[in-house]
Each structure stands twice: as structure tokens, then as C-alpha cells.
Amino acid sequence: MKNNKDMSKIQDMTFIRSLIIYGSQYGTTKRYAEELSRRTNIQVTTFKDVQEINNYDEIIYLGGLYAGGVLGMAKTLKKLNNISKKRIIIITVGLSDPTDETNINNIRNNIKKQLKKDIFERAKIFHLRGGIDYSKLNFAHKTMMKLLYNAVKNLPEEKKTAEDKAMIDTYNQKVDFLDFSSLDNIIDEIF
């Protein structure tokens, strides 16, 4: 009986039009999006190129975390109509530990500020760890990171967040925490 139920779920899925959209400044989020597309056989596009977003039943949005925001997410998801009939999955990609509860709460609160209430309440949210290569940052991002680093490096240890610690540990380095196996839970959610 379980096999029939599983098959029924798969048959139901064939009528769902899904789209993976990503916002990536330096490439880590793009790598996750393309791998997710490869594994799920779902079309992928950048938020800058997305068209006809309302033709899809399921939107899977991956966005890099920059200065508390998810790159391109608010601009893209505000175009959605008929929210009650959409399935929305949001995946953030950042430097800090995606299993740290304080970090997760901070990210969720920032997402909540960026989205309309109905979109936020419908969204399933996941967090992935990305990477950074300071040598590839543009001038504005290098300056911002230096200012942030200087602001948090001398904080008492108990006042530093997981995000602060990750920035201090990786400052001025090239690090890559990309882990494609972390997509497995997201794929389970999609199917």
C-alpha cells in the first residue's frame, strides 16, 4: 500500500510547475541552485532574469545573505499573485553556522521584515552554509566587511553572535563551506 501512496504522490507532483530562482553575488548560491536543479530536474534562473513567475505553482528561492537581507528575494517574491495557491521554499546561503538557533532566528526575523506576511507564513525556510573569497569582493563589500570586522572583533566573547564569530574566523581569507549533501532535506521537501 505504501508504494501506491508514494506513486500517487509522484503522479500528483507531475502537474506542479516548479522554478528555482537564485540571487548570488559571488557564486556560492548559484552553485547550490544549479546543483539543486540538476538533482531535481527543475528549471533554474537568476532573479534578474525571472519572467512570468506567476505561471509556476512552486517557487524555490535561493539567496545569498548580505547585510541581513537575502539577495533579490523581496524584489522577486513581491511579484507573486494568488499566494494561497503557491508553494514557496526559501533557502538562505551565508557564512555562519546554519544549525545555530540564534543565527536561524536572526535570519528568519530579517526575512520576515523583507516579505509580506502571507508570503512569509507560507514559506518553508532552509539555511545553507556558503563561502567567501575576500580577494573577489568589490570595493563596497570589502569596505563593509572591514567596518563590520572592526566593530565586532573586540566585543566580549559572550556578546558575539555566531555570525560575528564566523566573520572574525574567516576575515580576509578564502573559505568554502559548500556542502551539496545539505540539499538532501530540501529535495525531500520538494518531493
What does each model-found stretch correspond to?
Residues 10, 58, 68-191:
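FMN-binding flavodoxin-like domain, especially the glycine-rich phosphate-binding loop
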Residues 1-85, 188-189:
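N-terminal beta1-alpha1-beta2 submodule of the flavodoxin-like/Rossmannoid cofactor-binding fold
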